[in-house]
Amino acid sequence: MDETTLTPDRARQRFRAGLVRPAAGMAPGHAQANLVIVPRELAFDVLLFAPRNPKPCPVLGVLDAGETTGALLPGGDIRTDVPQYVVYENGVEVARPHDITPYWREDLVTVMLGCSFTFEDALQAHGIRLAHIDQGVNVPMYRTSRRCESAGRLSGPLVVSMRPVPAARVADAVRITSRYPAVHGAPVHVGDPGALGSRTWGHRTSATPCGSPPARFPCSGRAGSRRRPRWWSRLRRSPSPTPRATCSSPTPGTPTTRCPDGARERGGRALVHPCGVRSLPTRQPQPRPAVSRGSPVTPVARRRRLWLAALTRAGRGSRPVRHPGSPAATVPPGPGRRTPAPRAPRRCAPRSGRGTPCRRASRGTPGASSRGPGPCPRAAPVRRRPPPAPGGSAGSRPTWRPRRRSPALPAPRTRCPAVSR
C-alpha cells in the first residue's frame, strides 16, 4: 500500500504497529504537528515562548496535564501514535523510543506545534519536487547563528530545515508556503547561507543526509518553497545569477527571531527577500509605448492641431485666419495661385416688429444682407392682419386675431434689511 495516500487514522495505526519512517508526504491535505511534552511547571514558559517566536513555534493545540488524546486526534494516543520520540532529562538526550508509555506521568502537558510537512503536498501538486521525499529520508535541519527571543528558562538559536528548490521555482515555492502561516509559513531566508551565520550547510542537527540534485543551489528559507506569482513569467526570462536555490525552514526544536512573511517586490522590478538578500534577477524598465491615434487628445493638443490645419488651408488662398488670443492675420497665397476677391461683410436687417436688431445687425449697417438686397432671412416674420372676408363690411371685426400675451408681472419689491430695522 502506498504510504503517501494514508489517511490520518490509518497513518496513526501504522505508527502504533511499529512503522518507523518520516511522516513527510503522508496524509495529504491534513495538518501535521510536532509534539512538545513538558512538566506542568515548564508549561507556562513554553506557552510564553511560542507567541514570542510564532514562526518556528506555531501552536496548533494544547492538551491538559495527563491527557493523551484530544479533538485534533480523535481516537489517537500521543504516547504511541508517533514514529519516534526523543526523551531528554536535564537537557540531555537519554533515549529514542517508539512508545513513551513507560515514561508517562500525570503532570505532563502536551503542546502541538505546526509542522512544515503540511504544505509539501501542495508544493508537489505544483510540480516542485522535494529531494528528501524522493530519497526517502527526513528533511535536513541546520543550526544558525540567529537567536530566538527567550521566555523564562527557554532560550536557544534558530534551527531551520532546508529544502532544495530550482531557481526558476523559488517564487512559486514562496507563494505556496506563505498560505500556511500556521505551519511556519514563508521561508526565513533564500540565497546565501552565510546570511544565517554559516558559509556552508555544515551545522546539521540531524544525521540524515540529503544531497542537492544538479541545477539547484543552496538558498535558506523559513518553511520551504512556494508557488509562482503572475509577474514571475517576466522575471524568468532574465539570466539567473546562480544556478540553483534551496529553502530552509525553522523546526520547532529551537526557536527563531521574527521575520516578515514571504518575499516582496521592492521598486516594482526586483524581488527582494525581507532579510535584504536580492534573490531574483532584476528586470530593466521598458520604454513607454508611443501614444496611438486612438488615444485621447488633450485640449491644448487639439487647439494646436486645428491651428496648424488652418495655416495649411490658408496657404492655398488669402483667407483671414484668427489664432485664439491674437488679432486677425492674412496669410499670403501660395505661388501660382489666384487671390480670390474679398467678400462683402455680412449684414443683417433689424427684426421687424420687435424693435431690437439681431446680433448681425450690430456689426454693420442695418438693411443689408449677404444674400442680396432685402431684409435678412433670419429676421423675425411680420404678423399682418389678413384682409376682411368677402361680403363683409369694412367695419366688421376680422375673423383672425393675433395671440395676446399676458402682461409680465412686476418684480416683487424688497426692502434693505438695514432700512427695515
Curated annotation (Swiss-Prot):
Gene Ontology MF terms in the entry = lyase activity
> Where does the chain cross the membrane?
none
Query: What Gene3D superfamilies does the record tag this protein with?
Result: PSTPO5379-like, PSTPO5379-like domain
EC number(s): the record gives: 4.2.1.-
Which species is listed as the source? Answer: Kocuria rhizophila (strain ATCC 9341 / DSM 348 / NBRC 103217 / DC2201)
Classification from the root reads:
Bacteria, Bacillati, Actinomycetota, Actinomycetes, Micrococcales
| Keyword Lyase part of the UniProt annotation | yes
Q: Where is the composition biased (Low complexity)?
A: 243-260, 370-380
Against Pfam families, the record matches this protein to: D-Glu_cyclase
Descriptive protein name? Putative hydro-lyase KRH_21160
UniProt biased composition (Basic residues):
224-237
Q: Where is this region: Disordered?
A: 200-298, 312-421
Check the record and name the InterPro entries matching this protein: D-Glu_cyclase, Putative_hydro-lyase
Q: Which UniProt keywords apply?
A: Lyase
User: Belongs to which family?
Assistant: Belongs to the D-glutamate cyclase family.
